[in-house]
A protein has these predicted regions:
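Short coil turns that delineate tetratricopeptide repeat
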Residues: 72, 90, 148, 182, ...
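Alpha-solenoid helical repeat scaffolds
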Residues: 61-62, 79-80, 96-97, 121-122, ...
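Residue-level recognition of tetratricopeptide repeat
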Residues: 65, 83, 125, 159, ...
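Alpha-helical repeat scaffolds
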Residues: 15, 42-50, 60-64, 77-85, ...
Length: 515
């Protein structure tokens, strides 16, 4: 079996994690050569007063979170609060411990939040049920009531709502956070990521630009350059960014995403040497985003990047997926894909990659269905996911669930593309075959093949896929005794570069050998 899975096209857009996780990854630290005035900082005086009045775990955590965002971690009250938290080991959680350690500069050995390091299918089941997300929303509502002017709470709540597909509620919260603190790096990058998520790249670009810091802050500059690429434009910050990454005024970690974004620009221009050098610069002290971009560039464009062995990058699930696939280890890659999904449950990309691995490489249709279940939480009426979950459920003879998804697909109120309409017909054919209705199954598949032949794009690929699926069902229906179907399948001309189609046909041959 060929274990290649083509990674989706990638840009260095900002990841969006909950605030405490972002803090623990070091992405909100201040950087040299930029001195923000007191008027640019979100005031923490109220938090200090609350801490002095009531020295509790709750007050200490709140003060520390506000201090980190606003580059005030050296405040004596903040340091006192951090020490207080670490003295209450029996009353604090992992995130609170890590945040306090960060304040006291004991963060060198911090690990990614263990809550996202889940290797079992049970993790996917938890995300499908969304109980934890609803609990998170409930806790954040209480927090917002206590601190109605803290933008961080609204950003975190927006992320929780996006994870369960409530984009309108999420947008209201994002707008509130931007109103309270539009210059805040965490708020701006999270808001930009939200608008990219809902397809409004123009708004994302506007948010980053209006911070006023995208010409000085390397994290915001990286976002500006990448979002411009997504819009088919060239950022005005490229020249400034090139000067910045070779300046001694910035730490290697703070310019990692910037160097990666510039490397991607040069890669698209075809200047491979410049691209290689910039990617190598991004790997001096990478975060998970820049490391994944380098892995992607090596696979998709064969850029000869040097990735040091033994790099310990927190939450680098995506890059580990690509690395495992390069090593032809599908089982290891699905473990990392599940971690990635748990880390970014609102994002389609990890869901699509995880689905492809579990379906094409592992042929684990239960897992494929569960992965799509997570994707359908954040994208509840996505036609592709509804159809494909119906497909894998039908392949697994779970016909009731397959029919439920096809019913949802009929009423999803979204205009289907040509290829999606063909796939829907083919899936109806598969379900009919599994109901032992060969006549209807063959009729639906033949209609799908006919319609695929007249498609403007990807006609041959969609047609061949429908043919393979129909011939497989013919063979299964005949208990693999249909010699004409077998001969037709063997003689089917499949381009060697169409790995998914090659694997799909080989799967039929493998099943025949077991009979």
């Amino acid at each position: 079996m060929d274990y290649r899975v083509e990674p989706p096209r990638r840009k260095v857009i900002p990841n969006w994690r909950y605030y405490n996780n972002t803090v623990n990854l070091g992405e909100l630290t201040s950087y040299e050569n930029v001195n923000l005035s007191d008027t640019d900082l979100y005031p923490i005086d109220d938090y200090i007063t609350d801490w002095i009045d009531s020295k509790s775990v709750y007050r200490a955590s709140d003060l520390i979170s506000a201090a980190i965002t606003n580059s005030q971690k050296n405040n004596s009250h903040v340091i006192e609060a951090a020490k207080f938290l670490l003295s209450k080991q029996d009353k604090i959680n992992l995130v609170q411990q890590q945040t306090a350690e960060y304040i006291l500069a004991n963060h060198n050995n911090m690990q990614c939040d263990k809550d996202v390091l889940r290797l079992k299918n049970v993790a996917i089941e938890k995300l499908k049920s969304a109980n934890e997300t609803h609990n998170k929303i409930h806790a954040l509502r209480i927090y917002a009531h206590a601190y109605p002017f803290n933008p961080i709470v609204y950003v975190d709540m927006a992320r929780a709502y996006v994870t369960i597909g409530l984009k309108e509620k999420a947008e209201k919260l994002i707008r509130m956070a931007l109103y309270l603190d539009p210059k805040n790096r965490f708020v701006a990058r999270a808001a930009a990521r939200f608008y990219i998520h809902i397809g409004d790249n123009e708004r994302a670009a506007d948010i980053v630009r209006k911070t006023g810091f995208s010409r000085f802050d390397p994290w915001l500059m990286a976002s500006d350059i990448s979002i411009a690429m997504m819009r088919g434009k060239r950022s005005g910050n490229i020249k400034k960014g090139q000067q910045m990454i070779f300046s001694s005024s910035y730490t290697p970690f703070s310019i990692s995403e910037l160097a990666s974004a510039l490397g991607t620009v040069e890669m698209e221009y075809g200047t491979r040497k410049k691209s290689r050098d910039l990617f190598n610069q991004s790997l001096v002290a990478p975060n998970d985003n820049s490391l994944a971009q380098a892995e992607w560039a090596m696979i998709s464009a064969r850029i000869p990047i040097t990735i040091q062995s033994g790099l310990d990058v927190k939450c680098s699930h995506e890059s580990k997926v690509y690395k495992s696939l390069e090593l032809q280890d599908a089982r290891e890659s699905i473990h990392h894909a599940i971690d990635w999904i748990c880390d970014m449950p609102f994002s389609l990309k990890p869901v699509l990659v995880g689905y492809e691995i579990s379906t094409s490489l592992l042929r684990d249709y239960d897992l494929s269905s569960n992965i799509l279940g997570v994707g359908l939480k954040s994208h509840p009426n996505d036609p592709w996911m509804l159809n494909n979950r119906a497909y894998v459920n039908a392949r697994n003879n779970n016909l009731k669930e397959a029919e439920k998804d096809m019913e949802r697909l009929e009423h999803c109120n979204k205009e289907l593309s040509e290829s999606m309409s063909v796939c829907k017909e083919a899936t109806h054919g598969l379900i009919a075959y599994r109901h032992k209705d060969r006549e209807m199954g063959r009729k639906m598949y033949e209609q799908a093949i006919l319609h695929a032949s007249s498609m403007k794009e990807n006609s041959e690929e969609v047609k061949i896929k429908a043919q393979i699926n129909m011939l497989r069902e013919e063979l299964i229906f005949s208990n693999y005794q249909n010699s004409s179907a077998l001969m037709e399948l063997e003689q089917l001309v499949i381009p060697t570069e169409k790995i998914e189609l090659v694997n799909l046909r080989n799967e039929v041959f493998d099943e025949m050998k077991k009979k």
